[in-house]
Amino acid sequence: MLTPEQKAIVKATVPALEAHGETITRTFYASMFAAHPELLNIFNPANQQTGKQARSLAASVLAYAAHIDHPEALGGMVGRIAHKHVSLEVLPEHYPIVGQYLLGAIAGVLGDAAKPEILDAWAAAYGELADLMIGIEKGMYDAGAGQPGGWRDFRPFRVARKVAESRVITSFVLEPVGGGALPAYQPGQYLSLKVKVPGQERWQIRQYSLSDAPSPDHYRISVKREGGGLVSEYLHGAVQEGDELLVHVPAGDFVLQQSERPVVLISAGVGITPMLAMVQTLAQAGSQRPVTFIHAAQNGSVHAFRDDVARLTHEYPHFRKVVFYDEAGPDDQLGTHHDVAGRLSLDAVRGALPAGEAEFYYCGPAGFAGAVEAILDDLQVPAERRFTETFGPSQSFAPVILG
């Protein structure tokens, strides 16, 4: 257990970590992968190449150090990390490896400043965090495998249908090989896919949001084709109906809360996928919760699920939509295909927002999430009624300790 003296040492190292955090994490990843190349099967190499993962880990380490006296303050973020780890099949034996190379990187970058008492304090702090994460993740693994239809690790699914939803987004309907019932998921959660792209030495793991209401016999994900994206290009271009993909049990903490409050769903681009699962689930359950569905797309050619959302306006009496096109095409009709020309703005959505203390869910790229945060700040929406998912590593203590 960390002593008060060790906690004080960890907190005192925050300025040094702020100054050298990204260098430490880059050094950590390079040395760990050199010694344990098998871990490259867990990590997204694109995030390594761009430095996103190094920045993300540096931010995580800083947040942990700053909250070392009261780690329970990071409870929600720890849960998000645990969900991501479970989706990657991170195991207890991975934690000592990470600890060894993280401490080695701290020692190497800080040099003479890394006194033995500093390294001992950080070893104790990391040990406590590892024990916490291992315990939480064990509970998640046991729950995932123990529920009806559940499983552990990755299992084969067959692509039953492949459907183009827009010029850049394609849906994959997945059924378990051998059949059988599937465990239900919470709308907003995601699947992890493990694929071996031809010509690549390592397995690739990616997460994709489930994009419809839960079904007992299939899952659906909807994937945006990213220019230069190794896995998305492979899924769009090579994977066909009848092919098999390895799938992990659903995970994720960006889920619809069990309340009776009005719901505001705000998305951009492929961020529409978890929102569609949420609103379809409410509609199928006959919920009385008012839903305002706000979506931003470049234009109609990339706007996925337009017809699905339009149907909801007729089938779900408590549903209202506002669609923004910031670069409408010649065939995009204002009032039919989209409701507002231009970018998402507070003035344009204020009149569509429900009365009362609504819950706000928003999903999209990091820049979009920042714009939504500014709108919610103007509306004085408290943190406990904000729920968000950002694709890619977050720049806060929300991504992952390992991957």
Curated annotation (Swiss-Prot):
Residues binding FAD: Y190, R206, Q207, Y208, S209, T390, F391, G392, P393
Q: Which GO terms describe its biological process?
A: cellular response to nitrosative stress; nitric oxide catabolic process
For the site labelled Influences the redox potential of the prosthetic heme and FAD groups, the residues are: K84, E389
Name the residues that bind heme b.
H85
List its EC numbers: 1.14.12.17
Q: Matching HAMAP family, A to Z? A: Hmp
Q: Under which name does UniProt file this protein? A: Flavohemoprotein
Species whose genome carries this gene: Deinococcus radiodurans (strain ATCC 13939 / DSM 20539 / JCM 16871 / CCUG 27074 / LMG 4051 / NBRC 15346 / NCIMB 9279 / VKM B-1422 / R1)
- Gene that this sequence comes from: hmp
